[in-house]
Amino acid sequence: MERNLTTGSIWKNIFYFSLPYLLSYFLQTLYGMADLFIIGQFEGAAGTTAVSIGSQVMHMITVIIVGLAMGTTVSIAQAVGAKDKKQASRCTGNTITLFLGVSVVLMVILLLLVKPIVLVMSTPFEAVSGTVAYLTICFIGIPFIIAYNIISSIFRGLGDSKSPMYFIAVACAANIALDYLFMGALHLGPSGAALGTTLSQTLSVI
């Protein structure tokens, strides 16, 4: 729901706007934590290490994406504050077009560099194959990570920080359920963890 941040108490507006944002970011970090916790129940040290290293890489990439997406929030918020609907629409359209291209390029680059990235992370030999499998699947899901963050940035620019929180909360619940399915029932190991994460991120966009 769009919230008018230009009226009422400044501190109250900041608090009610920032709290859902902080919770959203916290929930986003739970993806890797949930993968680690669940794989530890079904796999050995190699599988757990693979997910641990893969989660670190994905967290770094997510932080970069979130940082880039913040520019969208600022641009749209300025246009909304100025009551310039055309500029707000223009910013939204340009952002979607730009990041659509960026997501595909970034996905291809990361897929080509997946093995060097695993080596740079000083991955133990026994965990290399699992880490490569985990990151390969997660990298395929990069467009959905970018899409979620861009959509969330647009909502926040419009003054709505609650909707992105609801999106990611549903995705986190789905991730946990899918992790137990893929790792517990189907015994897919690190690949199962990555599948759960990627599919739940897709759900957060849909």
Name the predicted role of every residue range:
Residues M1-S18, I76-G141, A185-I206:
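Short alpha-helical transmembrane segments in multi-pass integral membrane proteins
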Residues T7, W11-L30, A34, V57-I64, ...:
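Residue-level signal for short hydrophobic patches within transmembrane helices
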Residues Y21, Y25, F37, V74, ...:
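Transmembrane alpha-helix boundary and packing residues in multipass membrane permease domains
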Residues L30-M33, Q41-A45, A79-A82, G157-L158, ...:
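Helix-loop interface residues and adjacent transmembrane-helix termini in multi-pass membrane transporters
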Residues I39-H59, F125-G130, P190-L195:
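Interfacial/gating helices of multi-pass transporter permease domains
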Residues T48-V108, I145-P164:
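Small-residue-rich hydrophobic transmembrane alpha-helices
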Residues M60-V63, M107, N175-D179, V205:
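Hydrophobic transmembrane alpha-helices of multi-pass small-molecule transporters
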Residues F99, I154-A177, L195-T198:
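Alpha-helical transmembrane segments of multi-pass membrane transporters/permeases
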